[in-house]
Amino acid sequence: MRSLFRALVLAGPLIAAAPLAAQDDTTFSAEDVFALEYADDPRISPDGRTVLFVRRSNDIMSDRTEGAIWMVPVVGGEPRLVVDGASQAEWSPDGRRIVYSGRDSNDRAAIYTRWMDSGQVQQVASLDSGASSLAWSPDGQWIAFTSNVDAERKPLAKMPKKPEGAKWSDAVKVIDHAQFRRDGRGFLDPAFRHVFVVPANGGTPRKLTQGDFDHDGPLSWSRDGRSIYFSANRNEGWELQTVESDIYTVDVGSGALSQFTSGSGVEGNPQVSPDGGRVAFVCMPNVKRPVWQIDVCVKNADGSGARNLTQSLDREVGDIRWGGNRAIYFTFDDRGEKKIGRVSLDGRVT
């Protein structure tokens, strides 16, 4: 697990800051934000030798955070640029390719793969909305992802035909959902997040989930490649249930859904064990208390034996990863420091 520790350390501090203009006042100013850069989203190669990460920078011209995929040896060395203007890199199971999200020549959201030996890049698909939660199938033949699909909305009234050359005001915005605005984004376009699959060699994405619900990643494939785990709140009153989600599986062939968890509260971030026998996930019971805490839970792949493994730990769990088939590593904050913990399947935390 030494590679995991190195990758997590890599993601923490700022990796670079562009030189600031010489000035007498060294107080951090608003403009200095555009000089900051940091490393994010590390991914270790299957052979444990290389770490991919996203180098984030803030563009003063567009007022946006931009991403570029870089790589660095696990043992240390000089980072090298892999792809500019891209993010969400994921290694293929054999380590020969990576998949990532970016923009195509028409500035549309797109998914690409890159052969790491030759540098050859192939566009897998163009999308109307951005792709998230990219995940390779175990055999490397498919890529799963989530993407927003515009919701169908009936107009409030039938508008008259607009004369040629007329300059009308924007159409009235009809809001009929409780969750219509978010901090940092403003008003939300009516859309729902769905799970898709696309051939890794390119093709037409196929939508697996249906209904007016958000289906969230990260995504995790079953070891036989027949189904995909994800989280969602598919209850009728989901918009008013802010602390509720369950884990589902969707059959890749038929699109049939099966509910894997049904506890009260949040259950998400499913991670299938290497042998496929268990599924780890984060859980947070919806109970009436002043403070909620996210824990590590595990359940057998057949749906039996659900357990909370970190209930005795007075810390909130962050990201989780399997360490073999008998333990789960997780991140947590402790008095201002980011730490890594390990919990065995019998609940021993170290």
Predicted regions and their residues:
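Bacterial N-terminal signal peptides
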Residues: 7-17
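Beta-strand-rich domains and repeat architectures in extracellular enzymes and scaffolds
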Residues: 31-67
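Residue-level recognition of a conserved intra-blade site in WD40 beta-propeller repeats
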Residues: 44, 91, 136, 221, ...
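Sec/Tat signal peptide C-region and signal peptidase I cleavage site
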Residues: 18-22
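Hydrophobic beta-strand positions that form the internal "hydrophobic ladder"
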Residues: 48-51, 95-99, 140-143, 225-229, ...
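Short loop/turn segments that connect beta-strands within beta-propeller blades
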Residues: 73-77, 115-119, 199-203, 251-255, ...
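A short helix->beta-strand "capping" segment at the edge of beta-propeller domains
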Residues: 23-37, 205-208
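A flexible loop/linker signature enriched in serine peptidases of the S9 family
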Residues: 55-68, 81-88, 101-112, 120, ...
